[in-house]
Amino acid sequence: MKGNYLVIDKRVLPDVYEKVVFAQKLLKDGKVKEITEATKIAGISRSVYYKYKDYIFDFAETSQGKKVTFNLIVKDQTGVLSGIINYISEQGGNILTINQGIPLNGVANISVTIDMSTLIGDIKTLLNGLSDIQYVEKIEFVAME
């Protein structure tokens, strides 16, 4: 794996990093043509943009052709696991491994690893959709490869 990576919630980072991602998005979407214009709109200097542009990416951009592992805490109800599997399949995810622990105190832990290369959307959309499934109590991102 090239480099050393961390997944960090953007709420704990200085605003400058999110502004670099915003400038990248302006350029990628064709809303601006020049870096100078993108950095001005984003509120950062060109030197800041050039310093970080090759090292900061939106989480969704890193999901092509990768594997992701996440844990779900679900209520012990009939059909929850099949609902999760069906949703992942509908979104184009390829399940590589799935493990469910024995339910204790009415809840079970499920660990899922999927290949994201065929996802219809991005990983954020997938995880948000999974959290909307009835009886899914919590989703925790574990790792991305």
From Swiss-Prot:
Signal peptide: none annotated. Pfam families: ACT_4. This is UPF0735 ACT domain-containing protein CLL_A2896. It comes from Clostridium botulinum (strain Eklund 17B / Type B). Belongs to the UPF0735 family. Residues 69-144 form the ACT domain. InterPro entries: ACT-like_dom_sf, ACT_dom, UPF0735_ACT_dom-cont. It comes from the Bacteria. Gene3D superfamilies: 3.30.70.260.
